A protein has these predicted regions:
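Membrane-interfacial terminal anchoring regions of lipid-handling membrane enzymes
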Residues: 1-27, 31-39, 56-65, 136, ...
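Short gly/ser/thr-rich secondary-structure transition/capping motifs
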Residues: 51-59, 126-128, 183-185
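Generic preference for hydrophobic
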Residues: 58, 72, 95-96, 146, ...
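Catalytic core of membrane glycerolipid acyltransferases/transacylases, capturing the structured
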Residues: 14-15, 19-28, 37-38, 51, ...
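Non-catalytic C-terminal accessory region of glycerolipid acyltransferases
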Residues: 128-236
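A short, well-structured juxtamembrane/interface segment
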Residues: 43, 47-70
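Short, basic, glycine/proline-bearing loop/turn elements
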Residues: 45, 116-120, 151-152
Length: 236
């Protein structure tokens, strides 16, 4: 909490400008391209991280596909995860976020500007609808982030089981899967300190459709989970 307050304080001048601009970008009639909207948000996020006393170490950026129409599956450690992704991925990302967070100040406008989706984790029909929409949009050339654990891990760098249902969107889109390992992403907001923190984000080699075409969603989920877990163990 102390770091969040510090980040807000360090960006008091810029915050109203960001909120106004991103709110306008979230409107349906906005004329900015998807890349332009994303780049603006990424610049904002990079400043927030820099002035929030966090060093973001990025590895494996060369594994991010140069062509749109892919999905990113990271482990989930907390609120800082999306900041790390927006600050490190040059391709425009949309995200599936829990419904409870979709109404937070600034978050709701960022979601609108990135054309992201909120999902009710207690409503099976809503989950099916969102997963189906993600698959359609990725197939049409958009990029999405889904946290397959369903909720954040409360055990630091340990990761939870990946829910196989989220990978139905992959089967529908027939797209590259980019596993992402987040390391110490829980620390900036969970540790009640303003000491400088180091967060690592590792983009792993993409898993192409040819590799998973004959697999069940449960097998794909386990494969992605294991590759991320192995990368974390190797790096800490």
């Amino acid at each position: 909490m102390r770091r969040i307050i510090y980040m807000v304080f360090m960006n008091l001048f810029w915050a109203p400008i960001w909120m106004f601009t991103i709110h306008r970008m979230g409107r349906e009639e906005d004329t900015h391209t998807r890349q332009e909207r994303y780049d603006y948000i990424a610049r904002m996020v990079k400043r927030i991280i820099r002035y929030g006393r966090v060093n973001l170490v990025i590895k494996g950026q060369e594994h991010i596909p140069s062509e749109d129409g892919f999905m990113i599956f990271p482990n989930h450690q907390g609120l800082f995860d999306m900041l790390a992704l927006f600050a490190s991925c040059p391709r425009p990302l949309s995200v599936v976020i829990k419904k409870e967070a979709s109404g937070w100040i600034l978050v709701k406008d960022v979601l609108a500007a990135t054309r992201s989706l909120s999902m009710d984790r207690e409503d099976i029909k809503d989950q099916v609808r969102i997963i189906s929409e993600v698959g359609k949009r990725v197939k049409s050339g958009e990029n999405f982030v889904i946290f397959a654990e369903g909720h954040r891990s409360r055990k630091g760098n340990e990761i939870l089981e990946f829910k196989s249902g989220t990978f139905k969107s992959v089967m529908k889109a027939n797209c590259p899967i980019v596993p992402v390992a987040l390391i110490n992403s829980f620390r900036p907001f969970d540790i009640n300190s303003l000491e400088r923190e180091n967060v690592e984000i590792h983009y792993l080699p993409p898993i192409m459709p040819e590799e998973y075409k004959n697999m069940k969603t449960s097998q794909i989920a386990q494969m992605v989970h294991d590759r991320i877990e192995e990368e974390i163990r190797r790096s800490i």
